[in-house]
């Protein structure tokens, strides 16, 4: 990993490592997950979280098509996801896309907000980056402002 993810975390949020997570949770994703943070819940509950993922593009892949198609990828990856919205996110990231959706996990309704963008470096070429914020749907209103502010501060430094 030749890049660093920087984000100004909201109060009560902290960076996480693979050691902080249940065993096997990141199985098969170790090469793509670049950053994880979560809010420390007051009680045993689903913790609001941020997961930043980097996916290298192949030399024949069209970055624009990959960026737009990445919205479909989250729908295909998580059973029952319903996309609510997807729109350009130029105000957050040049060429970026902002999307939101809902799904149910272990009887808990969850809402996600995802920022996706393409970033190119001389050493790595083009990569798709996604920063996905997720929390219990009933708490989304309370966390949205913090999630949006964190997405504004998010940067990847090579």
Segment roles from a protein language model:
Residues 3, 18-128:
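Conserved polar/disulfide-associated segments of primarily extracytoplasmic proteins
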Residues 7, 101-103, 133:
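Preference for bulky hydrophobic residues occupying beta-strand positions
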Residues 11-13, 129-158:
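Surface-exposed amphipathic alpha-helical segments
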Residues 1-8:
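Short aromatic-glycine motifs in intrinsically disordered, low-complexity regions
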């Amino acid at each position: 990993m030749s890049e660093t993810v920087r984000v100004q975390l909201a109060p009560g949020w902290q960076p996480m490592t693979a050691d902080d997570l249940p065993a096997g949770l990141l199985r098969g994703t170790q090469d793509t997950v670049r950053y994880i943070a979560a809010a420390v819940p007051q009680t045993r509950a689903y913790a609001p979280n941020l997961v930043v993922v980097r996916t290298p593009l192949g030399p024949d892949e069209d970055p624009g098509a990959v960026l737009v198609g990445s919205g479909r990828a989250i729908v295909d990856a998580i059973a029952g996801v319903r996309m609510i919205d997807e729109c350009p996110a130029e105000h957050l990231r040049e060429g970026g896309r902002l999307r939101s959706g809902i799904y149910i996990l272990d009887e808990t309704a969850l809402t996600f907000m995802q920022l996706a963008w393409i970033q190119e470096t001389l050493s790595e070429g083009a990569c798709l980056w996604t920063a996905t914020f997720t929390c219990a749907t009933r708490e989304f209103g309370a966390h949205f402002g913090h999630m949006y502010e964190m997405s504004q501060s998010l940067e990847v430094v090579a």
